[in-house]
Amino acid sequence: MGATTYRVMSGFAAKGEPGTDSLAGMSKVVFSTTLREPLSWANTQLVSQEPVEAVREMKEKGLKSMRTIGSLTLCRSLLRAGLVDRFRVVTFPVITGSSGRERIYDGYPDVALEMISSRTFDRRIQLLEYVPTILAGPPGTTQSTPASTNR
């Protein structure tokens, strides 16, 4: 993951958000030239080396099972370099509309999503229905409380 994803995810983990406890025990690598040691999230290694070269070296040393979380720039560069073996898509219920570096939902505010229903069609397509809550600040920070009323 990159620095932005690390900040968001480690913030969720620090608050004990559901689903983050399993990540706490996993080894994690953060590619960043802006973060500094020590990192607060357990089992996290900071790598300031260029990510494509670092991942290539990790694979050459026999590390086979690696995953990315968020980090569109990182994912794109690894794909371009031919280092992506498989896509596993997981829907994470947060939209970083205003604080994400490369915004998929450009122009949207930051929104927390609460799933209210899900349905799978043809064992391929998932319909996920969420109730949005606009956040007062970036997800994973102390300011990420709901803004006034928006439901």
Where are these regions (language model features)?
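Enzymes that bind and transform nitrogen-containing heteroaromatic metabolites
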Residues: 1-151
